[in-house]
Swiss-Prot record:
It comes from the Bacteria. One of its GO terms (cellular component) is cytosol. The gene is infA1. Signal peptide: none annotated. This is Translation initiation factor IF-1 1. It comes from Oleidesulfovibrio alaskensis (strain ATCC BAA-1058 / DSM 17464 / G20). Keywords: Cytoplasm, Initiation factor, Protein biosynthesis, RNA-binding, rRNA-binding. Component of the 30S ribosomal translation pre-initiation complex which assembles on the 30S ribosome in the order IF-2 and IF-3, IF-1 and N-formylmethionyl-tRNA(fMet); mRNA recruitment can occur at any time during PIC assembly.
Length: 72
């Protein structure tokens, strides 16, 4: 189990980068670099610029995150 719990925030995808990375602007105005979670990759869930997503951030590095959810 993780030592520290992840911080979950919502944001909007600004641009798609190579290697399934995305630049996401969070609600509070910060920009983070995020990759898609394994389950989203497994079920071929598409993420496009302009999509609203949920991002998990590690308390150790708040500049990188994992996209965990994209509402329909």
């Amino acid at each position: 189990m993780a030592k520290e719990e992840a911080i979950t925030v919502t944001g909007v995808v600004q641009e798609a980068l190579p290697n399934a990375m995305f630049r996401v602007e969070l609600e509070n105005g910060h920009e983070v670099l995020a990759h898609i979670s394994g389950k989203m990759r497994k079920f071929h869930i598409r993420v496009l610029p302009g999509d609203k997503v949920s991002v998990e951030l590690s308390p150790y590095d708040l500049t990188r995150g994992r996209i965990t959810f994209r509402p329909r």
